[in-house]
Amino acid sequence: MATARRLDVVASHVRSPAASAEVEAYARDLRRAREDVCALLRETNCNPILVRLAWHDAGTHDARSGAGGADGSIRFELELAHGANAGLVKAVNYLRPIKERYARISWADVIQLAGATAIEECGGPRIPMRYGRADAEGPAKEGNLPDAEAPYGDGASDAATHLRNVFHRMGFDDREIVALSGAHTIGRAFKERSGVTEHGYGAKNGTKFTGCPFMRARADAADGEIGMPGGASWTRKWLVFNNDYFHREFLSEEKGQLLWLSTDDALTTDPGFAPHFMRYAHDQNAFFHEFAVAFAKLSELGSRFIIGPIVL
């Protein structure tokens, strides 16, 4: 996939030459930062954790109060210590050298740039992103992200109700909930992080899809460290972004080796979710299009743009 694309700068409200020059400089650094993220992905195959970081930074948003959102607050130690964010300090540390190299780019933009690039570089759709976000000055409150299994923090009696409580608070509808859940097509869960699986760190604790320290998950079968082996994945090729997550119910022979949570199951059984789940299983193009739009919306929740916005 091409790693350098034209930057269109949308800055109609910028009037002075000095302000225009600032936007252009920011855009140049975004372009360079994206190249550095691509290099990081090629070296480490860290696509899933960068997507998780972008989601967890944005997913604290409350549309009613305007609090939280994609504002870089997850960089603060207090927020990284939230239970839902276990393991994400690793993702922040992956991005820290890039942030330091391009100091004018906000943490909020670096995190969302990395998440979108991670999706695109493992076969996913082009995300219509905008940049120029301001950074938060402190951490978001704990408790706004969804739980994978009961008991649910919002007191919901079932997984479908819990998903709606969390995502409707952010402004997403049922179709968008299912589309965003498709991000589980990449990545793994670990006993030491979420606790939703018995599979933990290390090759001996992985499944047949996650136990090898080298690449079995990439589409090109190229060698490449995956970092810590282990954990459990939702799909067999967990470094390839496609619609395999929605085929999970048809892979009965692999059920013991693949992760499937109550919140995943709700998408296949709830009458409001299931039609979208089945549609994405049969139409990857529809999934890609609707995921890209929903992810772009997610990436701007609670964001305050102080430059541009700049369209990559």
Task: List the model feature ranges, each with a label.
Residues 1-5:
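N-terminal chloroplast transit peptides
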